[in-house]
């Protein structure tokens, strides 16, 4: 089995080198913002975080709340990198070893939190801070929350905790009171459509602005969903993204159907209207 897998990987690698093929990367990952100024639709939060860093006024426990796909984890990762970059002169250092991510949906027990607390005691070897990003924090058990309280209230000076959740109401009040809370908003249709236009231009795709607007509306404020829909429609329509292609792919009634229906009503053409 190992030999078969090794051979398959070798063949794929050789094909990529020979024919210039590259694995497809979804737009949500390919265009994930690397800097605060690249984050879409959360200017108030990104400006607040940048000012907090520059004025050395950053809380050690932050809670990022909001719907899915609006930039909570992205902002957490940017923040984690930026706070260690301050005053550091090595351009090639990414401080990856200073950032720990925990998915509370699958690591929600007391033992998981105690293991995290044991790590927190160890200071970073490079950079100023160790950053602990706990995603879906509302999934922690009651006992896990209680075990986490003391560390969250009095963290070591080298530790920053960033908690992210889509369901703030499920987090116990004692945790909320220990965190600086940032409420992420849904991305507006205009902001999402504008960002999709930039991506379309980057990929040399001729995109109808109405089509991009339809995708943004369908995403319902989630930029990640908008990018996922964009990838799907591009796979369907190729390098030309039209209103008709988006309507067909997303099972949306095209605006022409509405106009035609209104015309038939005004003309009192009941048979054609029923058809």
State the predicted function of each range.
Residues 2-181, 191, 199:
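P-loop/Walker A NTP-binding region and its immediately flanking N-terminal helices
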Residues 70, 76-85, 112-115, 128, ...:
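Extended, largely alpha-helical regulatory/partner-binding modules appended to the mid-to-C-terminal parts
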């Amino acid at each position: 089995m190992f030999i078969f897998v090794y051979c398959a990987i070798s063949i794929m690698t050789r094909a990529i080198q020979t024919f210039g093929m590259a694995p497809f990367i979804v737009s949500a990952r390919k265009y994930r913002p690397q800097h605060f100024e690249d984050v879409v639709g959360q200017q108030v939060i990104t400006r607040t975080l940048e000012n907090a860093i520059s004025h050395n006024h950053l809380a050690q426990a932050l809670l990022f709340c909001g719907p899915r796909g609006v930039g909570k984890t992205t902002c957490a990762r940017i923040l984690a990198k930026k706070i260690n970059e301050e005053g550091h002169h090595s351009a090639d250092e990414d401080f990856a070893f200073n950032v720990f991510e925990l998915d509370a949906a699958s690591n929600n027990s007391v033992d998981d939190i105690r293991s995290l607390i044991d790590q927190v005691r160890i200071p970073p070897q490079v950079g100023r801070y160790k950053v602990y990003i706990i995603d879906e924090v509302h999934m922690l058990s009651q006992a896990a929350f209680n075990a986490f309280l003391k560390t969250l209230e009095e963290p070591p000076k080298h530790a920053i905790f960033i908690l992210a959740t889509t369901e703030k109401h499920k987090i116990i009040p004692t945790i909320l009171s220990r965190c600086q809370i940032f409420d992420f908003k849904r991305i507006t249709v205009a902001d999402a459509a504008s960002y999709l236009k930039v991506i379309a231009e980057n990929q040399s795709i001729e995109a109808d602005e109405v089509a991009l607007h339809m995708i943004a509306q369908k995403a319902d404020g989630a930029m990640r969903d908008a990018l996922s829909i964009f990838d799907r429609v591009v796979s369907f329509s190729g390098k030309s993204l039209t209103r008709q292609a988006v309507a067909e792919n997303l099972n949306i009634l095209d605006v022409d159907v509405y106009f035609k229906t209104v015309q038939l009503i005004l003309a009192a053409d009941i048979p054609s209207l029923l058809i």
